[in-house]
């Protein structure tokens, strides 16, 4: 079957033996004729599976168409050759493109495989690193959280400590502020003349000086090694202390004798003011007034004076028992004390002061100060007593009657009596218990008590009693101003008048208490004293002069055995008699009720009459002042 290639849409069919092929693949028709149909295959058209060009022509064999057909073939060949060349060139280009495409595909395929493996490894490594990094970050965060928790606990503890320190610091600041305020209120003077700080500094300086002086006096070698300069200084001090006393001696001559005799048997009581006069504070103590009370000291030996000073505190349990029993009369109280005390120490007990064991709470802060000041004042009292002792001895040389001297006491009195007298004379009185509310008047109350607590008995009347006792027997001592006077030598009488009838100096009132000066002076001059029933005592004395019995002592045994009813009534009346109410100054009216209540409730009198001693005991609560003066035979 002949091939029928198709070239550019034409189909040529070659039949017969006349068909020839040209060297270029073009068919050639036989000379004898060409067929009607020719098949030509374009050699430039590539086949799908072969690179050769087959041209088939179908030429119908005919005589008239041979030449024409040949010419057409040649023309076609000529026209087909450039096209064939173009097709070949396109084929080459397509082949090259196909090779390039295959190479690109291969390369792309290889590249994809390589990139995937590398990326996979890279991704795995990155994921592993990221997981490790995450774990490290988590561990680090946990460690930081733990450290933060520890730091938080430490911060809380430090904050608590800081809070406590702040509280302590605030407390310290408050305490410091209160201390500064207290010191400023204590030491800063509100007024030049009324300052607690100034008073305290003065008291401190005076206390130091008195303490040094007391140490010098109490030293054992003081009597042997005392310098002349010290003696001169003591003499100057005594002269300075008694300079105001000499001025008052001239003034006392104008005082009526009745007022002097009234002062001789009276004792001023320091009253306990009410708490309404509280908001003042002044603890100034007048040392000069304390020294005046000890001017009756009669001694020549320093050791004897040391033995004479005795301050015995009362037993607190005894006071509690007395309070449980209820109010006891002063005489019964004194009789119970006489039962407990031996007869040997009776005189010593009479002259011994009692210190109250139970003081008010407001006075506790000042108690040690008063006691120390009192102990320091004893030394000055010793010097004053020695000076007056020398003066008394000089007057005794000129006197013709018995005097209160150590020679007379050595001749007629036992040693116990002398020691008891010295103990009484040299013992300063205790300070009264005053609350802090009455500070501006404390020094004045003390000065009133310290100046007027004593008995200034007129010895000319005592001399008269002695003469009557020698003639008629030993009657009881007369305490009346109506006793007849005895002729005494002028020098003795003058000395006695100067000694015993001299009123004490008025207290130096501070500036804060000046409006009440007249009130205190009226207390001293007119209204303080004991109401003694003189008529009953005189009746009893007249009866005793007829019977001539010995003077009974007011102790438990003699009172029950020999005391008559008249004396008992007079003594009871004396015990129960209180002092006259005071006519207070108008500016001091608000404190009147306190003085009255104090006098009505707390003051009781005990009278102990003996042939040698007259004891006046003032009992206020648990504070008893016992005093005595010798009655010479």
From Swiss-Prot:
Q: Name the cystine pairs.
A: none
Q: Where is the composition biased (Basic and acidic residues)?
A: 316-326
As recorded in UniProt, coiled-coil segments are 127-186
**GO terms for cellular component:** cytoplasm
Which compartment or compartments is the protein found in?
A: Cytoplasm
Query: What residue stretches are annotated with the Olduvai domain?
Result: 221-313, 314-402, 405-460, 461-552, 555-633
Which top-rank group of organisms is this from?
A: Eukaryota
Q: Which UniProt keywords apply?
A: Coiled coil, Cytoplasm, Repeat
- Summarize tissue expression: Expressed in testis and fetal heart, as well as in non small cell lung carcinoma and neuroblastoma cell line.
Residues covered by region (Disordered): 15-52, 316-370, 463-484
Q: Which InterPro entries match?
A: NBPF, Olduvai_dom
Q: Which family does it belong to?
A: Belongs to the NBPF family.
Add the further remark from the entry.
Encoded by one of the numerous copies of NBPF genes clustered in the p36, p12 and q21 region of the chromosome 1.
Name the PANTHER family on file. NEUROBLASTOMA BREAKPOINT FAMILY MEMBER 3, NEUROBLASTOMA BREAKPOINT FAMILY MEMBER 6-LIKE PROTEIN
Q: Write down what this protein is called.
A: NBPF family member NBPF3
Organism of provenance: Homo sapiens
